[in-house]
UniProtKB/Swiss-Prot annotation:
Pfam families: Ribosomal_L21e. GO terms for biological process: translation. Keywords: Ribonucleoprotein, Ribosomal protein. It comes from Methanococcus aeolicus (strain ATCC BAA-1280 / DSM 17508 / OCM 812 / Nankai-3). Belongs to the eukaryotic ribosomal protein eL21 family. One of its GO terms (cellular component) is ribonucleoprotein complex. The keyword Ribosomal protein applies. This is Large ribosomal subunit protein eL21. One of its GO terms (molecular function) is structural constituent of ribosome. The keyword Ubl conjugation does not apply. The gene is rpl21e. It comes from the Archaea.
Amino acid sequence: MQKSEGFRSGTRYKLKKHPRAKGLYPITRALKQFENGQTVHVILDPSVQKGMPHPKFHGKTGKIIGQRGSSFIVEVKDGHATKEIIARPQHLRECKN
């Protein structure tokens, strides 16, 4: 059988919520604002498909460099390259440093 090559392929465990975390996110997470230069973690929320970056960026840490509508532009290192991803605040967590 031919292997699927969709956007979410190979994410059976990566995009799975724990049983106690199932359901929709808190509304405050969607209204969260970040400052330019702030460090954030990219943690994908599988219950929100809009504004979700590619699953290979799940768990990466980056810097906010701008805003585009209700989404944020995050600069993330991918190997030796620096990439800009666009993500909604539901998929971003503030870094505690």
